[in-house]
Swiss-Prot record:
Organism listed in the record: Drosophila melanogaster
Example GO biological process: anatomical structure morphogenesis
Disulfide pattern: none
DNA-binding region as annotated in the record: 12-103
The UniProt record lists the keyword Protease: no
Compartments (UniProt record): Nucleus
Protein name: Fork head domain-containing protein FD4
Molecular function as annotated in GO: DNA-binding transcription factor activity, RNA polymerase II-specific; RNA polymerase II cis-regulatory region sequence-specific DNA binding
UniProt keywords, alphabetically: Developmental protein, DNA-binding, Nucleus, Transcription, Transcription regulation
Length: 372
């Protein structure tokens, strides 16, 4: 007996699983991907049975989307209205239906663990890049941001303040708010551009303002002898010690690090010595990454501040890409490396070179063995 046609289902439940219904909705889209709301709309428009008890079947459909590897969640482009990600069908899942029939499905589609982890990492990175450029476009152009050099990224760390602010009160007196404290290391031109961050007009504390109720004991070396040795009194007179009600703060530092200098000249020497002694560079703040930034993951080939970068600092690669996605099927092999140039003018990214694996390592990965 032939199966009934689609139009004759009426109020009866159609013989399609939730996976088949979702795949049918995705395939009906010109871009082969749809947000969740459009998937709901397609099903209710096509099959009257699903116009009632919507909460029940929509919960089941969301469960199938989340726990089936045949569906992938593609981040929404920032230039598209609406909210929520898009759902697409994995290219390797096209043959899970026998002879292209949505009524019969082969065994459950399952991705290899390594492929699934790689895909999730790439899609997460893509979502972060989309969010970053969306923030840049709304908050200001990347051309107005100060360039960042990873060689000087260590200089962007906040150096310790001359005096601890852990127990400072919220105000200097009744009705007088406590001003913001800006370290001396952040005021130079070699560090973050304060004019772009809107911090040029912040007041700074003077030495007399922060001297108030706090005092700082001399720092001690981190040795057993220094820890068990009693502290030497700062005041030779016992009367002065009794009258002194200032809060003492013990600060223990590792040997080899001198006390933070308070004079400008000594501060510059301290900064130079500190930079040379640091062995690792921190990740730069997100708001400072722009076309002039040399971050290993983000290689910009063109942009507003790229002229200041040496040509040798950016690796050569024949593949260039931007952040827009036009079709999920074109990005599955390497999602970030196969995006099309649609928007984000003056920002072109160069995909990093593919990591080489020896045949032995690749065989271990294919056999789902853990390698260290």
């Amino acid at each position: 007996m032939p199966r009934p046609s689609r139009e004759s289902y009426g109020e009866q439940k159609p013989p399609y699983s939730y996976i088949s219904l979702t795949a049918m909705a995705i395939w009906s889209s010109p871009e082969k991907m749809l947000p969740l709301s459009d998937i709901y709309k397609f099903i209710t428009d096509r099959f009257p049975y699903y116009r009632k008890n919507t909460q029940r079947w929509q919960n089941s459909l969301r469960h199938n989307l989340s726990f089936n590897d045949c569906f992938i969640k593609v981040p929404r482009r920032p230039d598209r209205p609406g909210k929520g990600a898009y759902w697409a069908l994995h290219p390797q899942a096209f043959d899970m239906f026998e002879n292209g029939s949505l009524l019969r499905r082969r065994k459950r589609f399952k991705l290899h663990k390594n492929d699934k982890d790689l895909l999730n990492e790439e899609l997460t990175a893509l979502a972060n890049l989309n969010r970053f450029f969306f923030t840049t476009r709304n908050g200001g152009s990347a051309a107005h941001m100060s360039p960042l050099d990873m060689n000087n990224a260590a200089a962007m760390r906040l150096d310790p303040l001359p005096r601890s602010t852990a127990h400072m009160p919220n105000s200097l007196g009744p009705g007088v708010p406590l001003p913001h404290v800006m370290p001396a290391s952040m005021s130079g031109a070699d560090h973050t551009n304060l004019a772009d961050m809107g911090l040029t007009n912040l007041p700074a504390l003077t030495s007399s303002e922060i001297e108030g109720p706090l005092s700082l004991r001399p720092k001690r070396s981190f040795t057993i002898e220094s820890l068990i040795t009693p502290d030497k009194p700062e005041h030779p007179s016992e009367d002065e010690d009794d009258e002194d009600d200032r809060v003492d703060i013990d600060v223990v530092e590792c040997s080899g690090i001198s006390r933070y200098p308070t004079t400008p000249a000594a501060s510059e020497e301290y900064m130079s010595a500190s930079r040379s002694s640091r062995t690792e560079d921190p990740l730069p703040p997100m708001h400072t990454i722009n076309a002039g930034a040399h971050v290993p993951f983000l290689h910009y080939a063109t942009g507003a501040n790229v002229a200041g970068l040496p040509a040798s600092g950016i690796p050569n690669s024949p593949t260039t890409y931007e952040l827009a996605i036009s079709h999920p099927l074109f990005m599955m092999a390497a999602p970030i490396a196969n995006m099309h140039n649609i928007y984000y003018n003056n920002v072109t990214l160069v995909a990093p070179a593919q990591q080489y694996r020896s045949p032995e390592v690749q065989n271990r990965i294919d056999n789902d063995m853990r390698t260290i």
